[in-house]
Amino acid sequence: MQDDGTTCSARVTMKEVAHHAGVSQSTVSFVLNGNDDMRISAETRRKVLKAVAELGYRPRGAGRPPKAVGHGVIGVMFDEVATSPFASISIEGMQEEAWKSGVLVEVVMTGGDPNYEAAVLRKWAADRVEGVVYGSILTRRVAPPELLSRHRAVLMNCYDPEARYASVVPAERRGGEAATQELIAAGHRRIAFISGEPWMEASDQRMEGYERALRAAGLPVDPALIVEGNFLPSGGHAATLRLLDRGRPDAIFCANDLMAVGCYEALKERGERVGETIAVMGYDDQEIAQHLNPPLSTVLLPHREMGQWCAARILEGTPIPSTTLRMACPSVLRNSHGKRQTSAVIYQTFDEKR
């Protein structure tokens, strides 16, 4: 913790370097990896390297070459990849962790097709991969394919109700609770919540955390302050207008950042000033969050760390307990939640048990 009471992340990320340099993460990656065939100007390269030096950025694994460069492979199986930025983030985490041991990552997208899953798992068994990560874009219960039992396997962002495999998911209830606590700590009492679609477990659990924080603070859970959205800007916009028509809240907690985008638009249409007259909190910490005006306070989904955890469990060689780890979701405090603070990441140091 710094002298001014703010808390900073322990490691500078490539995302922060890109923001500091005013370029994309892809550009930072190409510059740092020495891709001279890319048409990146000398000025852009200079800006990236300057940002790296000023922020003290060190790639994960820097100074720690692979223990033994080999040809081992971890198979990673997702139902979808292209529909979400979080899959690529988790894959990066797996690659970083696996490469420390000289192991590569092979990714397939199955579309949830059981026949395709079976074919891939048979191939990986023949290839004698180190293990398999079975993942889902949406946090949910799954019925893992039978052939997964041939492999050393873990589940990512999903869980097996029969507890046959170890799994890791975000601690969504605790994330929702912590976000609401930040709004309460900022002095807000009439705190509204815009949920996602009710069939999504993540949305339900974030709302449970919101309600838990209100009750713990002695505040009522008012049904009039809870409105269903759709995880899209359009849903956040429509839900915010409904909330304003029912009576002005002090703060609005949106169950994801995309709905917060629509919430911003609706508030500005009604003459409100985000972070001043009405506070807003998001969830996910998508790229757009830091570029909103004011920058959006939100909650980070730990997909990179989840990916690292999966690769580490596959490679550690010891038996993997068939339990579900709920990984902490840090609050990312910027300027929309009603406190005048510098951008800071507050890391919870525990995992959700409830």
Task: Give the positions of each predicted feature.
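Hinge/beta->alpha junction and helix N-cap segments in small-molecule ligand-binding domains
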Residues: 79-89, 107-116, 138, 168-178, ...
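Short beta-strand segments enriched in small/hydrophobic residues
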Residues: 25-30, 66-81, 190-196
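Central regulatory/effector-binding core of bacterial HTH transcription factors
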Residues: 96-140
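N-terminal helix-turn-helix/winged-helix DNA-binding helices
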Residues: 2-13, 52-86, 101, 124-126
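Short acidic capping loops at alpha-helix termini that bridge into adjacent secondary structure
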Residues: 190, 221-225, 273-279
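Flexible loop/turn connectors
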Residues: 241-354
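Flexible loop/hinge segments that line or gate small-molecule binding clefts
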Residues: 130-178, 219, 258, 284-296
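Extreme N-terminal segment that seeds HTH/winged-HTH DNA-binding domains in transcriptional regulators
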Residues: 1-21, 350, 354
